[in-house]
Amino acid sequence: MATPRTLVPILPPVAALLLLLVAASSIPILAAAQPADACGGAPDQAAADGACHDVPRALRLKLIAIPTILVSSVVGVCLPLLSRSVPALRPDGGLFAVVKAFASGVILATGYMHVLPDAFNNLTSPCLPRKPWSEFPFAAFVAMLAAVSTLMADSLMLTYYNRSKPRPSSGGDVAAVADHGESPDQGHRHGHGHGHGHGMAVAKPDDVEATQVQLRRNRVVVQVLEIGIVVHSVVIGLGMGASQNVCTIRPLVAAMCFHQMFEGMGLGGCILQAEYGRRMRSVLVFFFSTTTPFGIALGLALTRVYRDNSPTALIVVGLLNAASAGLLHYMALVELLAADFMGPKLQGNVRLQLAAFLAVLLGAGGMSVMAKWA
């Protein structure tokens, strides 16, 4: 008889390895960036002539930013994971749906208002040759390809889960699989499942199947969303770490704390619904929380080598930003917002649906305002 342990997929460790490769691959690529500015000057040249260019103050701000952003990330992603102890914040509650909608709005605005504009700025920079970069909208094209590729990966990963899952063949199996959480000790471990159940109802096979399909889908969402977040977090951290512009770094720290906290809440809600074990939750929390501080530290280490307006850096960072934007757009609209708003919880409660819409607008609006400084 298959227990819920057999339903733990093989792909999460692979996804974790991909996250490591994404972060590590940026080191040789960005270290190869040209030390000389192709535009004929040093980066942050406008600030270099004024009070904004202050290397010691910039270093202090960046050293403060690393633990501050780390703590904000940990708090944001862990709040939903600790919500089971608070009845009002449990995943089946209305407040959880509203908070998740707010966080989804933050993720949506991150893609549209922060990451995609940066990609356009990178790939249309005057530091790049006019041909082909100014003659074709590469940022939009790569974002579109990334969204379609995310759909393809989402579909293929879900197919993998569905084909590799065990199928319950008896009432006892149904009762065992009905408990799809992390602990196989719960539910009918004795496997009788005759329906009298000592007051416990045995789930119907169709209900169990639907529950398991949704669980597998939630796990796919977590993996794909985390990859997109990691990519743009490393890029943002790298830019902050390499900059010597105090006027840019100071507001960026505050904006990144806001961004990481609420983006973490969205990711944490998805992790909670995916019902991963403690080890996998820890891995996902670790990668989300440390990627931006890692990017800042990487930027500090490459300050003398990395030039953010060299052609190599502009192309690499611009393409990564465009791909990340397409992924975030798809995940926010399709997997998070559409899935929740078309689901039975919000469809069955108009008041809750309106509250969730308002939360999306507030989250997206707040993150859009942050685009003025970051």
Curated annotation (Swiss-Prot):
Residues 34-62, 114-137, 241-251, 304-313 are extracellular. NCBIfam families: zip. Belongs to the ZIP transporter (TC 2.A.5) family. This is Fe(2+) transport protein 1. Residues 166-199 are annotated as: Disordered. Residues 1-33 form the signal peptide. InterPro entries: ZIP, Zn/Fe_permease_fun/pln. Expressed in companion cells in the upper region of the root. GO terms for cellular component: plasma membrane. Iron transporter involved in the uptake of iron from the rhizosphere across the plasma membrane in the root epidermal layer. May also transport other divalent cations. It holds the Pfam family Zip. Residues 179-188 have a biased composition (Basic and acidic residues). It is a multi-pass membrane protein. Residues 84-92, 159-219, 273-282, 335-353 are cytoplasmic. Its main location: membrane.
